[in-house]
């Protein structure tokens, strides 16, 4: 998607008098040479896949390694008992993030947003919101366009893969996408979307990618939670009028620079961080012997 800066989107919004989501929609139409209806039908497929993944989660499946599985259901049950300190919407965001990320680890069908490893963040903030607010299908699709536009800019200016820029590039980008989508759903303007994106990325800048045994399981599943909760927090801050002192495009560029300078041990190689702990090494050795 040919969007190379958030500033470009903001300028087009001002010049054309169109909302953020529509600028992204029209860019998709131009890039893929599709009609408006075709573009929206494709986005609806993405939303339905997210919803189906959530509905299909039972908590009974475990990953092949046995490292993850069932935590999403534990959180759901904890919420139902009324014991969650966060309560309400945020506690459901946590449960959904765990459930979706576990589904990926257990070979379920998910939507990479922007990657499979970060697939739990965006649906985690959107799906529970449908229970608390009356959101039309069109509003949800608009939010997904906002998220995809943000992801496209970050992919162009920085990176979205853990192997390229660490977990900040995956979970950080997913969190920024989710934050922008939430602000759009709450009626925020382009500048508020930009501030939410900037704050989301700043909060997770420098986060390394250190998967135990090289699997997208530990700590990846639980990091989807922090990405989702971070998105909710910064969306609220942006809607409250709190701003990022560093412009969003500069924040994106900084994240890219941090990623490029990050040692290879912290970019999905399983050579550093949690993967290099005694327990991490032991798990990897156990899996090697059993394969």
Feature annotation, model-predicted:
Residues 184-291:
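Functionally critical mobile loop/hinge segments
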Residues 85, 112-119, 131, 136, ...:
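Glycine- and small hydrophobic-enriched segments that form the cores of compact globular domains
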Residues 155, 160-168, 174-175, 179, ...:
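N-terminal glycine-/lysine-enriched basic segments
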Residues 87-104, 139-158, 203-211:
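Acidic-glycine-rich active-site phosphate/pyrophosphate-binding loop
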Residues 107-110, 160-166, 218:
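Active-site-adjacent structural elements in folded domains
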Residues 1-108, 131-132, 241, 248-291:
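Generic N-terminal targeting/processing segments that precede catalytic cores or assembly contacts
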């Amino acid at each position: 998607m040919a969007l190379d800066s958030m500033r470009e989107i903001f300028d087009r919004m001002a010049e054309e008098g169109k909302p953020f989501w529509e600028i992204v929609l029209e860019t998709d139409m131009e890039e893929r040479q599709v009609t408006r209806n075709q573009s929206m039908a494709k986005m609806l497929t993405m939303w339905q896949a997210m919803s189906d993944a959530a509905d299909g989660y039972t908590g009974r499946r475990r990953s092949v390694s046995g490292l993850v599985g069932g935590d999403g259901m534990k959180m759901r049950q904890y919420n139902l008992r009324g014991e969650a300190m966060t309560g309400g919407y945020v506690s459901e965001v946590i449960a959904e993030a765990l459930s979706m990320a576990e589904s990926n680890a257990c070979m379920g069908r998910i939507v990479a947003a922007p990657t499979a490893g970060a697939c739990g963040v965006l649906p985690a903030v959107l799906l529970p919101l449908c229970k608390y607010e009356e959101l039309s299908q069109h509003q949800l699709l608009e939010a997904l366009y906002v998220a995809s536009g943000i992801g496209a800019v970050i992919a162009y200016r920085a990176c979205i893969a853990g192997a390229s820029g660490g977990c900040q590039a995956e979970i950080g980008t997913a969190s920024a996408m989710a934050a922008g989508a939430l602000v759009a759903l709450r009626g925020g303007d382009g500048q508020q979307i930009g501030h939410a994106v900037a704050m989301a990325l700043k909060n997770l800048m420098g986060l390394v990618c250190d998967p135990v045994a090289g699997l997208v399981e530990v700590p990846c599943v639980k990091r989807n939670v922090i990405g989702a909760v971070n998105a909710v927090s910064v969306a609220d801050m942006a809607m409250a009028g709190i701003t990022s002192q560093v412009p969003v495009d500069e924040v994106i560029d900084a994240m890219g620079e941090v990623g490029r300078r990050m040692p290879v041990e912290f970019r999905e190689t399983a050579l550093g961080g949690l993967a290099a702990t005694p327990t991490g090494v032991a798990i990897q050795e156990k899996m090697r012997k059993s394969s």
